[in-house]
């Protein structure tokens, strides 16, 4: 049976939670493979709305085993807050598995993240301030704390001491902050050990055995392709690999096991935080997209920057991820526009460019080249098949498909679980 990767094909916030939830009833495992509680997924089930930051969206599907892989960074306080909130609403969270090799976001990681952004001022990246970047930095510098370290106090103490030797120098001498005591951090982290224990597992072994047993495994990326540390709009990126290759390293599953890679595309474009955004709108259209689309970050609460659909970015996502399908979301938000511009290329220094610029400088100077497509006024939220859509909406979808380089196999026409048109089965 297949292993599928589902990821954002833009700058995140594309509606991955809706897509994962749709597939959750048909898969056996849903796996987060990177990121942390800097991601935000909103899932609507009936009249219930769930905002998830760290937990896989599949936790809302009763027959599914949710997994937090080794590539994820885990803030235990956020984890237990989310679990408690779901339990209070009657959601069974007992099947959750967490990799013992996942790294822990420590209190000093959060502190460093916040004071660094404050210190940088106008030069800041616009992080969520949740300690994600510093935790990944510790991982690369080999001073990170892993989940399994919570079960050996001696090793945990040594690792915290080693990390704070450097962190406290930075906090006291550069940022004029108080030093953080090793004992205080160790005590707090050890306090999570017993609560975490029922969930900790060798998830690499579990997932590979599941695939050998013909189970269906869905790998769920956080953020989006253009926020990838290697393939995104660096330095305005996240600290991990949301792209398809990250599923292999972040979950411990070989690339030959993956059969489909599904990119989630919003029918327009949004971005949170700093960085280039060629199709960004600063007029009433941008404000209307933000208002109608409810474009406010689930994690940050910040208003999202909004713009028209960018086919250059979509083609890039197809290439770097090897996308086999697209899931187009929020098509309903565009209802009411008489004309809908779509960016088909950029103009850079007077030249037309149809692929994403290699140079950061060029991307900053890219101006969108638009083609205008006719809009529609009919309500599409009740559409159950592609033929139910107005002709102009059908033409819009077909145009995006042709420009983006992979078939659009599903379309979101509203926030609800049942407000989806499935054109081709993902399984």
From Swiss-Prot:
Keywords assigned: Cytoplasm, GTP-binding, Ligase, Magnesium, Metal-binding, Nucleotide-binding, Purine biosynthesis
One Gene Ontology cellular component: cytoplasm
Cofactor(s), names only, from the UniProt record: Mg(2+)
Name of one Pfam family that matches: Adenylsucc_synt
Binding-site list for substrate: 298-304
Localization per Swiss-Prot or TrEMBL: Cytoplasm
GO molecular function: adenylosuccinate synthase activity; GTP binding; magnesium ion binding
Keyword hit for Isomerase: no
Positions annotated to bind GTP: 12-18, 40-42, 304, 330-332, 412-414
Pathway: Purine metabolism; AMP biosynthesis via de novo pathway; AMP from IMP: step 1/2
Chain residues that bind Mg(2+): 13, 40
Active site feature: 13 (proton acceptor), 41 (proton donor)
Catalytically driven reaction(s): IMP + L-aspartate + GTP = N(6)-(1,2-dicarboxyethyl)-AMP + GDP + phosphate + 2 H(+)
InterPro entries with a match to the protein in the record: Adenylosuccin_syn_GTP-bd, Adenylosuccin_syn_Lys_AS, Adenylosuccinate_synth_dom1, Adenylosuccinate_synth_dom2, Adenylosuccinate_synth_dom3, Adenylosuccinate_synthetase, P-loop_NTPase
Positions bound to IMP: 13-16, 38-41, 128, 142, 223, 238, 302
Subunit structure: Homodimer.
Membership in a protein family: Belongs to the adenylosuccinate synthetase family.
Name of this protein: Adenylosuccinate synthetase
Organism encoding this protein: Streptomyces coelicolor (strain ATCC BAA-471 / A3(2) / M145)
């Amino acid at each position: 049976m297949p292993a599928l990767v589902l990821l954002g094909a833009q700058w995140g916030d594309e509606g991955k939670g809706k897509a994962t939830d749709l597939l959750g009833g048909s898969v056996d495992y849903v796996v987060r493979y990177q990121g942390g509680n800097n991601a935000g997924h909103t899932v609507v089930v009936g009249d219930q709305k769930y905002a998830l930051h760290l937990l896989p969206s599949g936790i809302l599907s009763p027959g599914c085993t949710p997994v937090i892989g080794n590539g994820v960074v885990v803030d235990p306080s956020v984890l237990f807050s989310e679990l408690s909130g779901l339990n209070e609403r009657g959601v069974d969270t007992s099947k959750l598995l967490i990799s013992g090799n996942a790294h822990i976001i420590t209190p000093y990681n959060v502190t460093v993240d916040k004071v660094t952004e404050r210190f940088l001022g106008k030069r800041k990246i616009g992080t969520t301030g949740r300690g994600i970047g510093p935790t990944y930095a510790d991982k690369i510098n080999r001073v990170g704390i892993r989940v399994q370290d919570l079960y050996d106090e001696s090793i945990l103490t040594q690792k915290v001491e080693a990390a704070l030797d450097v962190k406290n120098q930075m906090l006291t001498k550069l940022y004029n902050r108080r030093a953080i005591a090793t004992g205080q951090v160790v005590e707090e982290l050890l306090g999570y050990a017993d609560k975490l224990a029922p969930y900790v597992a060798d998830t690499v072994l579990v997932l590979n055995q599941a695939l050998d047993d013909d189970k269906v495994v869905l790998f769920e990326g956080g953020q989006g392709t253009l926020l990838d540390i290697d393939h995104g709009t660096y330095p305005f990126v996240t600290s991990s690999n949301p792209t398809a290759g990250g599923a292999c390293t972040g979950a411990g599953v070989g690339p030959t096991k993956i059969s489909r890679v599904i990119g989630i595309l919003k029918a327009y474009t949004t971005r949170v935080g700093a960085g280039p955004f060629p199709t960004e709108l600063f007029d009433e259209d941008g404000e209307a997209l933000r208002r109608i689309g409810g474009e406010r970050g689930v994690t940050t609460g910040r208003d999202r920057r909004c713009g028209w659909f960018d086919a250059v970015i979509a083609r890039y996502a197809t290439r770097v991820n090897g996308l086999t399908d697209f899931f187009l979301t929020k098509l309903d938000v565009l209802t009411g526009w008489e004309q809908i511009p779509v960016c088909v290329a950029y103009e850079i220094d007077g030249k037309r460019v149809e692929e994403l610029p290699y140079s950061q400088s060029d991307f900053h100077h890219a101006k969108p080249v638009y083609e205008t497509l006719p809009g529609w006024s009919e309500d599409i939220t009740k559409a159950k098949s592609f033929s139910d859509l107005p002709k102009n909406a059908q033409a819009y979808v077909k145009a995006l498909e042709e420009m983006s380089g992979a078939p659009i196999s599903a379309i979101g026409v509203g926030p609800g679980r049942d407000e989806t048109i499935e054109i081709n089965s993902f399984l």
